[in-house]
């Protein structure tokens, strides 16, 4: 099988990822589990050539110099793929993450109603967090799409690499990729403030300068979407503040308290019937109570504020998991595996 056939097989089987690893058969991740494809093992040359053939010259140069590279590419009529090519102890390796060609709506994702409201906020910072593979990009794409369909404005995305490709609808959308279009997230963000955006998506807030510029953009009247790999709202606030030197922490807490609109922390859970996965969310909104807790460095008290904020659209992850179990969507065992307090999910 060539790479196109392998990727077509992967998409047909609803795999989120295709793994190629020298010395082993190709494998796919379906509903969270990695399974072998019933074909022969691939040697180093086969994996190397499959990946090398779909790279452009600049990607090959990065791969040869650094021994790894991130990029995205599209097979017309099939899907887009985010690729990480690397080297390992048996030879070449690569992972292809499937990015559906069609962007799902918030309704199709069965996202909480508050997500649509957050997508249309005039300013402030909305963070979607969670581990790798938790569906952050899918959620953000749906929120950007909702904004694009409902508001006349300028949406600017900065990604590494570009994943979901948006068409300009009511809004003008410009998508920039780190590498081909800009040297770094921080460079692109610095320029963004001079590019008349209403909304800026920062694919990954991975360093101090990017976080500082994203906060500044939110403070100066822009809607900023960003992602972090944190697992809860409280850890997200701590992560942002902890990046800064001690002398700046108090000022940063004040900036975060003023600009933070919401933190959505999500985790993917296997459906009880085994046919797929569903996202469970912790949702923290920037209420006056939450803003005060951030400003006063009382992050530990956030959880109880989220717990009691259901009427405002807030929920803890465990509250959402309880609801999913009650509705027979996921099993108690799956909820227990994802919960903050597993003891609340016996059985």
Q: Language-model features: where?
A:
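Short, flexible helix-loop junctions that flank or precede catalytic/ligand sites
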Residues: 1-347
